[in-house]
Amino acid sequence: MGIITCSNVTKKFGDFTALNKVSIDIPKGEIFGLLGPNGAGKTTLIRIINQISLPDGGEVFFDGKPLTPGAVESIGYLPEERGLYKKMKVGEQAIYLAKLKGMSAAQATKELKEWFVKFKIQGWWDKKVEELSKGMAQKVQFITTVMHKPKLLILDEPFSGFDPVNVSLIRSEILRLKAEGTTIILSTHNMESVEELCDNIALINKSNLILSGNVDEIRRKYGNNQKEIIYKGQVPLNISNAPVKVVSDEPFKGNRRAVVEVVSDATNAQILSELIKDTEIVSYQELIPRMSDIFIKLVSNN
């Protein structure tokens, strides 16, 4: 059993079913992608895990035990809609939020000062939140989310509003936290981040779980047995004797790039042995679909 296990979780709002018997298991120490289009039910599930809302059916377990309000101290939650108090000073507010998570003022001050040095924001301590830019405020909220060293960290669109430099900074911190044993739920529409960061994912659409599993295994499963061939020449690829059909063939950086689909059980060695008779091959590799393509395909067909 993972750090979070949801078994047949159902949530209704009147006649509307927001979650319909959703079952997922989130392994410890991993980055787990919680995916789905707007309105799919992701936020409802996050609110249930955070004890903000209760399920109408099913069970939720935290670290092998039924989820209780006391588990919240072991969870850090960064919502998509940020919520710092604009009139409070940054340091004062951060200490207040840390105390809500069970830290003493002394512990919080020590931890915060280390984070402020790491993020190079020492001069922000006495600033009011309303004086900060959106990106600056998001840095502060990220710190307040992680400073109590939660077992489980839930990040809802954590890179939203950040410039590339700060995206890289936050991504590095997420990977460091994972390396230290923190389990992270990443809720995002950015499929590039999913491919880069996530070990496993769950895809929810229209209140139902429609896909779950390891990211690399899912990408291979939804492949079309296609290969990418970069080759020298100015004319289209000669495939008269190769067991493939051409999907596309076009100029590419001084060479040509062809995408072919294997139409038999031929091995890569057999395919290449036919191609190299008439063509100088620069590169040959399996073409694995992007998570964005899989997301669009499944959500559109569901």
Which residues make up each language-model segment?
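Short, Lys/Arg-enriched, disordered terminal segments
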Residues: 1-4, 300-302
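ABC transporter nucleotide-binding domains
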Residues: 2-4, 11-205, 211
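Residue-level recognition of well-ordered beta-strand positions that form the cores
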Residues: 7, 25, 230-232
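Alpha-helix N-cap/helix-start and coil->helix boundary motif
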Residues: 10, 68, 91, 184, ...
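Solvent-exposed polar/charged
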Residues: 145, 195-196, 220, 277, ...
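ABC transporter nucleotide-binding domain
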Residues: 172-260
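Short, charged/small-residue-rich alpha-helical element at the C-terminal edge
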Residues: 226-302
